[in-house]
Curated annotation (Swiss-Prot):
Interacts with DIO2. Component of the probable ECS(WSB1) E3 ubiquitin-protein ligase complex which contains CUL5, RNF7/RBX2, Elongin BC complex and WSB1. Component of a probable ECS-like E3 ubiquitin-protein ligase complex which contains CUL5, RBX1, Elongin BC complex and WSB1. Interacts with CUL5, RNF7, ELOB and ELOC. Binds to HIPK2 through WD40 repeats. WD repeats lie at residues 124-165, 168-208, 212-251, 254-293, 309-346. Probable substrate-recognition component of a SCF-like ECS (Elongin-Cullin-SOCS-box protein) E3 ubiquitin ligase complex which mediates the ubiquitination and subsequent proteasomal degradation of target proteins. Recognizes type II iodothyronine deiodinase/DIO2. Confers constitutive instability to HIPK2 through proteasomal degradation. This is WD repeat and SOCS box-containing protein 1. Pathway: Protein modification; protein ubiquitination. Pfam families: SOCS_box, WD40. Residues 372-421 form the SOCS box domain.
Length: 421
């Protein structure tokens, strides 16, 4: 069994350049478990980076200061303590334009977190009440944390203060995602087999419960235009939801094991799902077609082997903001960077016990969290996108596959616009 196809020479694949690392503090002597970093996230405006460093703690650091610290210290021996020192000096130096860092004790093990930013003109989708406890301004930045006890806590990123405590799940909250349109609509995925929709502009009231999963729900993601939601879970489940009507659109079938992560491309034309079956699939969410398969074990395992303990479980997947690259993280101690039109990684990086990953807001850095609560950063593959790709993304942001197929253009252009050529 190999990690790459026989035609590929592993030594010829480019190694990603390490940017830096944030090492978790030593575990308390009375804590034998709970130190995993299950989630990392970048703020939508790139101002903050957050990760769960285990033992109930979430760390919020100004991303620009963190990157500056990496440059000052080089790519090795950079810890969270050095980043802490830099941020603290800036905050005490009277520079008000420098955002402060925060260490947040969430009260229980943190399984998920997500940033949300508000747009004042976006009204609540559910009710229009004159009085609200919270009136979020244009510069409001929130952090949602999903806990082991089923609670969701909402924090003010700039002050580190707790704003809301959302209570309804009866098991751990495995993933959280905010609608990217600034409406502060939050969706939570839980091991209680449900997804719940919360409206933070309505003081955190629950809008809807989405039920279709028969087992744990691992992850969820909004499409860029907020019209669709993807949810994935145990028993090979991949569901697409209409978020205007809160109804299920379709179930995508093809995986052979639990599906644990999902992400949409920036134009909403593609959907990537990662599974314990050693594969990442790229789908067309508008018609359910499978477009691409990224394998992590060769020869490709049979469904029986893929559905078991195959030592190549894919833990995470993330789309780059250029729409050209996908990152995946697997149990073979490797991070892979893929082009959407190639079935072999263009770059790789070593990582033991990886659990999660996320691209920075500008797509230049990938952050990955590990079993011991640390975070590692790599420079991502960068290239100037072609004019054709830029035009394709612009078109696909506003047109579904069905609408594209009706365009009076040559078949080759239709194939390109549909990510089939």
């Amino acid at each position: 069994m190999a990690s790459f196809p026989p035609r590929v020479n592993e030594k010829e694949i480019v190694r990603s350049r390490t940017i830096g690392e944030l090492l978790a503090p030593a575990a308390p002597f009375d804590k034998k478990c709970g130190g995993e970093n299950w989630t990392v996230a970048f703020a939508p405006d790139g101002s903050y980076f957050a990760w769960s460093q285990g033992y109930r703690i979430v760390k919020l650091v100004p991303w620009s200061q963190c990157r500056k610290n990496f440059l000052l210290h080089g790519s090795k021996n950079v810890t969270n303590s050095s980043c802490l020192k830099l941020a603290r000096q800036n905050s005490n130096g009277g520079q008000k334009n420098k955002p402060p860092e925060h260490v947040i004790d969430c009260g229980d093990i943190v399984w998920s977190l997500a940033f949300g930013s508000s747009v004042p003109e976006k009204q609540s989708r559910c009710v229009n009440i004159e009085w609200h406890r919270f009136r979020f301004g244009q510069d409001q930045l929130l952090l949602a944390t999903g806990l082991n006890n089923g609670r969701i806590k909402i924090w003010d990123v700039y002050t580190g203060k707790l704003l809301l405590n959302l209570v309804d799940h009866i098991e751990m909250v495995r993933d959280l995602t905010f609608a990217p349109d600034g409406s502060l609509l939050l969706v939570s995925a839980s091991r209680d087999k449900t997804l719940r929709v919360w409206d933070l502009k309505d003081d955190g009231n629950m809008v809807k419960v989405l039920r279709a999963h028969q087992n744990w729900v691992y992850s969820c993601a909004f499409s860029p235009d907020c019209s669709m939601l993807c949810s994935v879970g145990a028993s090979k489940a991949v569901f697409l939801w209409n978020m205007d009507k809160y109804t299920m659109i379709r179930k995508l079938e093809g995986h052979h094991h639990d599906v644990v992560a999902c992400d949409f491309s920036p134009d909403g034309a593609l959907l990537a799902t990662a599974s314990y079956d050693t594969r990442v699939y790229v789908w067309d969410p508008h018609n359910g077609d499978l477009l691409m398969e990224f394998g992590h074990l060769f020869p490709s395992p049979t469904p029986i082997f893929a559905g078991g303990a195959n030592d190549r479980w894919v833990r995470a997947v993330s789309f780059s903001h250029d729409g050209l690259h996908v990152a995946s993280l697997a149990d073979d101690k490797m991070v892979r960077f893929w082009r959407i039109d190639e079935d072999c990684p263009v770059q790789v990086a070593p990582l033991s016990n990886g659990l999660c990953c996320a691209f920075s807001t500008d797509g230049s850095v990938l952050a990955a969290g590990t079993h011991d609560g640390s975070v590692y950063f790599w420079a991502t593959p960068r290239q100037v996108p072609s004019l054709q790709h830029i035009c394709r993304m612009s078109i696909r942001r506003v047109m579904s596959t069905q609408e594209v197929q009706k365009l009076p253009v040559p078949s080759k252009i239709l194939a390109f616009l549909s990510y089939r050529g």
